[in-house]
Amino acid sequence: MKTVVSVSQGSSDADYELETEFLGQPFRILRIGTDGDLSRAEAVLESVRPQADAIGLSMIHDHYQVGREQLEHPETARLEACVPDIPVTTGAGLRGILQEWAIRHTQTELGHFFDNARVLFLNGQAGYRIARSLSEHTENLQFADPYLDFGVPRLLTSLTQLETYTRLTAPVMFQPMAVKAINALHHSPLYRLGEKLVSGSLHSAVQDSHVIVGAVGDLESFTSKELDGKTVITSRVTDSVLDWMRSRKVAMVVDYSPWLAGRPIGVNVMEAMISAALSRTPEQLGPDDYLDVIQSLGIEPRILYPNGYRRVNRFAFVIHPLSQQYLTKTPPLDWISSVSPPAVMNLVEKAVAYTPPFIYSKVSGIRSPTGEEAEGWLITVGGTPREIMAHGPEFTYSRLLAAAKLAKKLGAQIMGLGAFTKVVGDAGITVAKRAPLPITTGNSYSASGALWAAHDAVKRIGRVSIGESGKMAGKAMVVGATGAIGSVCARLLAKAVEEIYLAAPEPAKLLALKESIEQETPGAIVHVAGSADRDVADMDMIVTATSGAGKRILDIMRVKPGCVITDVARPLDIPAEDVAKRPDVLVIESGEIQLPGEPRMKDIGLPAGIAYACLAETIVLTLEGRFENFTLGRNIEWEKVREIYKMGLKHGMELASISGVNGVFSEEDFERVRVLAAQSEDEADPQAVAAN
């Protein structure tokens, strides 16, 4: 029987002894903790020397390879020198392989998990292999080595900085004079005075990160305030450690340590066992030796969820002021607007269009029934629709790309475009080609939400029946039918309504759309018109989806009583004063979506927990982990409209209470439209009046 001894600088309370079989050979494993006493560790090494076939050193500084620098810690070298005739290892060779594999395994298993994640290394030199692997998926790497080494509240923010820091500090780090100077600094009154500030700065860095890499012992000072929702990459996660993670609300743990005899063991122990089993020193072990052991034992990283399955994905969404009036709601512009004439505010509106993007609000609390969560940021670009349309596409492209750069830095894995930012130029295609993360316009869910809301409203008013074909026995019109959202609404309405009318000032595109719909939906009755006015009086349902930027696109006084108008456009196609003229018509502001969970964000002009459909599409894709360019350009695929609708249902999205320009519609509002429409019919039909 071969004997492997693990001499640890950790607590002796965790000592154990076990016998097991390894690579077909019987092994005895002995763990001896020395409670941080280096002299005691030397004595233990001397005492176990006659019986040990290999020795592992645990909870002591490893020999690190960082860039081209090889760090050899003098205390580790001192212990290794105690037993020159026996293989001694810290597990560095195997640890590097398991660390890197843990990252690649997790990224493959969970898909895009580390994309743009903000990662904090409590010891970057020890986690260098992890950092190199993560750098393939994110540039948002931070290293707290200056905190731990010198108590300096400064984070390194790249692998290059870590390598430079190591190159500069390694020659003096372990010199006796340097060690004394550092200890003296840590015990000086000046350092004690700023110690809380340094500690608070590190705690803040942990709270702002998405992934934490470090030993379990390095995490002890952090609470659920910092660790809630975080992913921790560490080793030797026992049941008690998992309970500790659970109490801190950690979302996920990646444990790269190997298991043996039903328990996690130190990587140093496993490498010492390999060395003893193969009768080679750790320096003589090669890649094939490690691969044979890993595969024969079935060792793989563990992905653990302390509080049940929980995955937190991240998004960004670009918004902008929809009118000059929106600018007056933001300090200090609210004060300026109160004392300035319109001419000054016009200049302010022009100036604000040139401001760089900034974070308007953090979004949190979105939880799917499946266990996924989404958090994100609303990023504002300054241009109103008037200013956006007054400039060429490149003006807006440059601001959207700046927003995408900010989103990536924040950790977003996908970015959505809102309102007029998604109709400029080629409707997102150019931005997606240049952006450092996936882009979606949200138009697929906007189309879905518009028809969802219209269908629900028509049913609740109850004036249109279902015909023999199974479709709505009535007429529906799409105004702005050749646009991105309008064309998809037209395709879907053709499958749900017996007769549809398409209105847009682009005859050639209308004819092509009509032809396409008739091929997709045999038997569909499709009419086309250059404007809405000619046929609007006969419609039971109207969807407006123009980019008119406030221009009047239909005469509401000609609309049929009881008609449901869904206004998808932003800014709205139908102004509030027009809506007030027709109490017998229901004008709804497209289909806003009720988000799952307990969403928290600043005011976006909707009731709490409700989002515009384009924002909801970005959130649905985030919850689904579909980090791809989903909806781009003006020709939306109706298959994607259907797909995003199904994904939304899966993640708990619901049609919100239908709203109009004056807020949420009540049952009394639907009844009012129903009654007034019936009265209008009676007044228009003398025979009906006589019968009454």
Predicted regions span which residues?
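N-terminal basic/disordered segments at the start of proteins
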Residues: 1-25, 294-370
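Electropositive, gly/pro-rich neighborhoods at or near active sites that engage anionic ligands
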Residues: 7-138, 142-151, 298, 307-313, ...
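Glycine/serine-rich phosphate-binding loop and adjoining beta1-alpha1 elements at the start
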Residues: 63-104, 366-470, 602-612, 616-617, ...
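Glycine-rich phosphate/diphosphate-binding loop of Rossmann-like nucleotide-binding domains
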Residues: 116, 125-181, 456-544
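Active-site rim beta-loop-alpha module in soluble metabolic enzymes
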Residues: 152-217
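Rossmann-fold NAD(P) dinucleotide-binding segment
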Residues: 221-227, 537-538, 548-563
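ADP-ribose/adenylate-binding Rossmann-like module
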Residues: 230-244, 414, 557-596
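Adenosine-phosphate binding glycine-rich loop
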Residues: 253-323, 333, 358, 364, ...
